[in-house]
């Protein structure tokens, strides 16, 4: 009886994951037997399932360890899971009209999104290297198929192949790093690895293990120098799937990196008063990502490739907070990723809303004179672009404020200064789009917006515009989540 009670208590901890897994199996059956309208039926039920899972996490918070620390359920994991679920939910909402018009409205699409989301939830709660890899691969395999799901489109097929090949390489790097750490410590748990290494001189093999693990994880957030897949996949994949790639997987991967760093690497003492190896790697990736995001996007005219480089830059700014290695830094990342998700949803809703009678907008110069033909869209996107450029009092400004403040508090003043300079440079290409929309001569008018696009645009614009008034609410929850990670 006692054992049964303990098993039930353990299963309650992962109830959201169980709900998603059961939902996937049920939706597969529904999709097969619902005939011609299977796509809309399954998509609607998937959106309802994601919303129900968010409600479950919010109303019934549970803390604990599942199966000897394989999964860790705490305030941090709940916060990041909610963000991930919101990202998946809005991606599906945005996909409805696009999928129908582009003739790939197949019921497997929302189910693959659910499979990827389940993998992300496992990643976020990972407590050891085994659960880390299982969650990561469940997410990755679903994402490879999603990238190439538009089989009649050459660019989509090319994006899927590129993502698969480079993703397999990153998985190999990650596995090799895990094997090195396991070989030198005999442990797979994050905290156990830290305990085994702490106080001892780090062997060269351990340092290589740390490097390979961080390299494999950096691929998932498109951090330089593991960003090569991002522009091509963003451009080639269908736009709603690009919106999904830009949001939920980045949040889950960042959560995983945070947990690995905080549990396994931060407790390690650096020798000879020198900066720890993990911190050197993070600083290099942060500066490189911020620099590439600032300079590479300047020459881009394809709007999805531009958003790809923008995303790389944003991950660099988030890594600034992680390099600080303290509670304030993790809190800054949580706030940054919250704001980043809001801006991403709004930006891709705009891209999906900008459609001519025969095609979607691909070039930023197609937006010329938008304020004259569609003032609502011009105003909403201007708000988003000001936020992406981190111009106060928009939400994007506060995201960078928290991460740079954490870096300064940790003594990484040069890193914060470099970040601020690159942020100013990166604002150029956002302001260029505003100039095109407001001051260039108008082109052809666009088709009427669908209701789901209007909903996403309005919610996102209100979020980034009025964050200054209710941001303290997110700050409070982010602080609780960050604190739970260091306990």
Swiss-Prot record:
Quaternary structure per UniProt?
NDH-1 is composed of 14 different subunits. Subunits NuoA, H, J, K, L, M, N constitute the membrane sector of the complex.
Topology relative to the lipid bilayer, per the entry, is: Multi-pass membrane protein
Q: Which Pfam families match?
A: Proton_antipo_M (PF00361)
Identify the enzyme class. Answer: translocase
Species name: Bartonella bacilliformis (strain ATCC 35685 / KC583 / Herrer 020/F12,63)
Q: Which domain of life is it from?
A: Bacteria
- Which family does this protein fall into? Belongs to the complex I subunit 2 family.
Q: Gene that codes for this?
A: nuoN
UniProt entry keywords in alphabetical sequence: Cell inner membrane, Cell membrane, Membrane, NAD, Quinone, Translocase, Transmembrane, Transmembrane helix, Transport, Ubiquinone
What job does the chain carry out? NDH-1 shuttles electrons from NADH, via FMN and iron-sulfur (Fe-S) centers, to quinones in the respiratory chain. The immediate electron acceptor for the enzyme in this species is believed to be ubiquinone. Couples the redox reaction to proton translocation (for every two electrons transferred, four hydrogen ions are translocated across the cytoplasmic membrane), and thus conserves the redox energy in a proton gradient.
So what does this thing catalyse? a quinone + NADH + 5 H(+)(in) = a quinol + NAD(+) + 4 H(+)(out)
EC annotation?
A: 7.1.1.-
Instruction: Name the Gene Ontology molecular function terms of this record.
Output: NADH dehydrogenase (ubiquinone) activity; NADH:ubiquinone reductase (non-electrogenic) activity; quinone binding
GO BP: ATP synthesis coupled electron transport
- What is the protein named? NADH-quinone oxidoreductase subunit N
Localization, UniProt: Cell inner membrane
Q: Which HAMAP family match?
A: NDH1_NuoN_1
* Predominant subcellular localization, coarse grouping: membrane
NCBIfam families for this protein: NDH_I_N, PRK05777.1-3
Give TM segment ranges.
Answer: 12-32, 40-60, 79-99, 104-124, 129-149, 164-184, 201-221, 248-268, 281-301, 310-330, 332-352, 378-398, 411-431, 455-475
GO terms for cellular component: plasma membrane
